Regions:
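Extended, charged helical/alpha-beta scaffold domains that provide interaction surfaces
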Residues: 1-181
Length: 181
């Protein structure tokens, strides 16, 4: 569907911004999981420094996502996601002010098409590899159809996540230059 929208020249800006938002939210969930089982310290396994390192240099600066200990106690993953997404929006808005809406919409289409095509081709290769390997599972007394179905769903979800993550990273790191530059 997204590929068809791109090829038809449709505006994919809302979808690209949603991909950026979802990619950020996914990373925040990984680095800042809330442990509801540990009611006294649900943040004990947070890796805020790891999250900062992941985005440092292309979305964050040294002064971003710095919290005092008392602030960390009240900090919620949603707030961190909102902060990161606001930075992403700022990058996109500044680019649009500098280069114009038409160029930015074309950039979004090109980046999205490249990522969808690349990830889809990788997915097809991985599915062929899964199909070859699934036959061996029948020897392990596992139903190959069930195994194939479960793994193929997981692989498809991983492909979608990779499209989101790569599109977000490319949209936020690509550098455009004017003819004067």
């Amino acid at each position: 569907k997204q590929r068809d929208q791109v090829l038809n020249g449709e505006n994919v800006h809302p979808q690209v911004m949603e991909m950026i938002k979802q990619a950020i939210e996914n990373q925040v969930k990984i680095y800042l999981p809330m442990d509801d089982a540990d009611l006294d310290n649900p943040r004990h396994n947070w890796n805020l420094d790891g999250l900062r390192d992941r985005y440092m240099g292309w979305l964050l600066t040294e002064n971003d996502l710095i919290y005092r200990d008392e602030e960390k106690k009240e900090l919620k993953p949603e707030k961190v996601s909102e902060t990161l997404y606001a930075k992403a929006e700022q990058i996109c808005n500044l680019r649009e002010q500098k280069f114009g809406e038409d160029i930015c919409r074309e950039l979004e289409r090109v980046i999205l098409l490249k990522n969808v095509d690349t990830q889809w081709m990788d997915h097809i290769d991985a599915m062929e590899e899964l199909q070859r390997g699934i036959r061996l599972r029948a020897y392990g007394q596992k139903d190959p159809v069930v195994e194939y179905r479960m793994e193929s769903y997981d692989m498809f979800d991983a492909m979608i996540d990779a499209i989101r993550e790569n599109t977000a990273r490319m949209m936020l790191t690509v550098r455009l230059h004017t003819q004067e530059e």
